Structures are given as C-alpha cells and as structure tokens.
C-alpha cells in the first residue's frame, strides 16, 4: 500500500498548496524531467521567513513514467484532502511502480515513485533519482 514520506530538501520539508510554484517543466532526450520555479519562503521547515521566495530547480533523472493532473481533480480522484501536508513526497511501497510492466532488461528496484504538488497540478514521477537545488 502506498505510503507517502515527506522529502527533506535543502529548504526542509515543503508544505501546503501555496508552497511550490511552477514556471516550467522540461523533458530532455536523456529521460530527465526538470521543474523550475519558486518556493514560498513562509511554507518551508528550514530558512523559513528568510526570504519571501526561493528559486528552485528540481531535475528527476532516468524518468521511466510520469503523469500530471490538475490538483483539485487529483484530490477528488484520490479521495483525500492533501492541502496541508508535504508538497514533495517519496511514495514507498508504490502500487503504481509495482504494477508498471517494464522491459525485462530494466531493474525495477532502482526506481522510486515521487509525488510533487504544485499550486495548480500534481505530478507523479517514476525515476531513479532527483536533485533539488534552491537559491539560498
């Protein structure tokens, strides 16, 4: 069963609907998916209130699959309110990852399921790793 665990970033835990603002999502030819935008400096657990906004870059590496959904629709789909929880989670024991019919030459054990709540949308991403960087 899916278990969401908050990802601890260089800004600490990112929390709430107004925390992550997205300017751009880019996918390159190497299966990397990169998010860029701003983090609300009042909705983080470290460096809180030092700045109103922190620029961030969040590339996911070796992306196997991802999907996006409008936030309110996603919450209705999941039948759970999420607005005051973590905005960036690692989904442990992921049902979606377990059910993916990957190629035989792929090692499914190296992949992780991440969930990112932005102001407008929710992204579920299956990737090998990520790197979160913010301008402190």
Show where each model-derived region lies.
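Surface-exposed, interaction-prone regions used to assemble/regulate multi-protein complexes
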Residues: 1-136
């Amino acid at each position: 069963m899916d278990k969401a665990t908050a990802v601890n970033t260089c800004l600490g835990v990112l929390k709430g609907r107004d925390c992550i603002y997205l300017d751009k999502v880019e996918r390159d030819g190497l299966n990397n998916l990169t998010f860029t935008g701003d983090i609300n400096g009042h909705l983080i657990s470290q460096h809180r209130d030092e700045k109103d906004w922190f620029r961030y870059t969040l590339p996911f590496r070796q992306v196997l699959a991802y999907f996006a959904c409008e936030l309110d629709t996603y919450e209705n789909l999941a039948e759970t309110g999420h607005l005051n929880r973590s905005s960036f989670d690692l989904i442990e024991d992921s049902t979606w990852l377990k059910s993916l019919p990957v190629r035989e030459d792929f090692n499914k054990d190296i992949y992780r399921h991440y969930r990112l709540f932005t102001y407008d949308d929710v992204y579920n991403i299956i990737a090998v790793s990520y790197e979160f960087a913010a301008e402190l």
